[in-house]
């Protein structure tokens, strides 16, 4: 199949940042996706519906003329989030979920939840109102190996949480392990997962063999090839529990290429082509539309998009770097490499 037309996809996990960064990130994402779940880990974080609406206005100011883009907003879950904020989310036109970062798990997560049991009163309201809880699924204890943090989260946090709140609508974001994939498969349909392009296309060898490649460094970290293979299998299976979430995360070249580089891969400019490559490599390109355009919207209870995009099987070289902020550069995922699909 050399050409594929699909309903325009949505990105159910993206980082746009704020301020000057929006000049780069919003057009890149809006040219690819009709909607995006916009992560709230700004400085300071987006903690209320009013703050989310204000952030959305800042995003909309950078949408290119003639492009339809609908940012879907998320609140940042803290130890101090009020149960009453959940009803405001439910009644909001643009806010769809709340995001729980374990404190210290990833970029700008210091304000995250210190102990999930402290916020059970809020989670009870999430379950009652069927507001999705989005989870960065890693424990943050210093003694736990970084490659084991997702599995430990499943055992120590997520299993008890779902026993306590079995009807909770929940997305385990950017899953990276076989254990996470199987966990999601074993749950009822109120539990789903997003998968990034980097975790489908690459594994930890790509990051570590032949020199450290900082632009493959993200959290949760790339895992073994066996885990990568399981993710490919579930993503291309047609199971509606798994859908697209890039976790596209912009950091300047200087912030990535230093002695203590930031975590995050910037995939937004060619995201759907990267996913197409992953699906095509296992001869499942016909399954891409469900994963990219159907299952996320269905889970969130939003209508599927009606406009379409077309991808052609035609080589394109991903740019070596892109302009970012005032005078900095950003290195996109797989920079300088050739991929076999192009959005037209």
From Swiss-Prot:
One of its GO terms (cellular component) is cytosol. Substrate binds at residues 15-17, 41, 136, 219, 251, 263. Binds 2 Zn(2+) ions per subunit. The keyword Cell inner membrane does not apply. Zn(2+) 2 binds at residues 99, 136, 174. GO terms for molecular function: dihydroorotase activity; zinc ion binding. Its EC number is 3.5.2.3. Transmembrane segments: none annotated. It comes from the Bacteria. PROSITE patterns: DIHYDROOROTASE_1 (PS00482), DIHYDROOROTASE_2 (PS00483). Pathway: Pyrimidine metabolism; UMP biosynthesis via de novo pathway; (S)-dihydroorotate from bicarbonate: step 3/3. This is Dihydroorotase. Its cofactor is Zn(2+). HAMAP family: PyrC_classII. CDD domains: DHOase. GO terms for biological process: 'de novo' pyrimidine nucleobase biosynthetic process; 'de novo' UMP biosynthetic process. Catalyzes the reversible cyclization of carbamoyl aspartate to dihydroorotate. The active site is at residue 247. Gene3D superfamilies: Metal-dependent hydrolases. Belongs to the metallo-dependent hydrolases superfamily. DHOase family. Class II DHOase subfamily.
């Amino acid at each position: 199949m050399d050409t594929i037309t699909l309903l325009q996809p949505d990105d159910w996990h993206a980082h746009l940042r704020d301020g000057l960064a929006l000049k780069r990130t919003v057009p890149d994402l809006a040219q690819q996706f009709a909607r995006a779940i916009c992560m709230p880990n700004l400085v300071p974080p987006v903690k209320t519906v009013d703050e989310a609406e204000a952030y959305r206005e800042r995003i909309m100011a950078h949408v290119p003329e003639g492009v339809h883009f609908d940012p879907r907003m998320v609140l940042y879950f803290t130890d101090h989030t009020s149960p009453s904020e959940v009803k405001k989310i439910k009644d909001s036109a643009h806010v769809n979920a709340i995001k729980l970062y374990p404190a210290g798990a990833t970029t700008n997560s210091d304000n995250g939840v210190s102990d999930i049991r402290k916020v059970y009163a809020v989670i009870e309201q999430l379950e009652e109102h069927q507001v999705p809880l989005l989870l960065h699924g890693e424990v943050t204890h210093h003694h736990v190996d970084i490659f084991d943090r997702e599995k430990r989260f499943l055992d120590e946090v997520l299993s008890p949480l779902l026993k306590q709140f079995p009807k909770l609508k929940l997305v385990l974001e950017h899953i990276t392990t076989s254990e996470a994939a199987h966990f999601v498969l074993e749950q009822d349909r109120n539990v789903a997962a997003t998968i990034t392009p980097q975790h489908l296309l690459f594994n930890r060898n790509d990051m570590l063999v032949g020199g450290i490649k900082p632009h493959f460094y993200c959290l949760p970290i790339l895992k073994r090839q066996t885990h990568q293979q399981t993710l490919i299998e579930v993503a291309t299976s047609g199971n509606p529990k798994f859908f697209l979430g890039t976790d596209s995360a912009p950091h300047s070249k200087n912030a990535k290429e230093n002695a203590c580089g930031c975590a995050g891969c910037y995939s937004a400019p060619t995201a759907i082509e990267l996913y197409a490559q992953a699906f095509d490599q296992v001869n499942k390109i016909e399954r891409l539309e469900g994963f990219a355009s159907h299952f996320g919207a269905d889970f969130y209870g939003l209508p599927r998009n009606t406009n379409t995009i077309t991808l052609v099987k035609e080589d394109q070289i991903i740019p070596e770097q892109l302009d970012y902020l005032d005078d900095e550069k950003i290195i996109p995922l797989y920079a300088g490499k050739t991929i076999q699909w192009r959005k037209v």
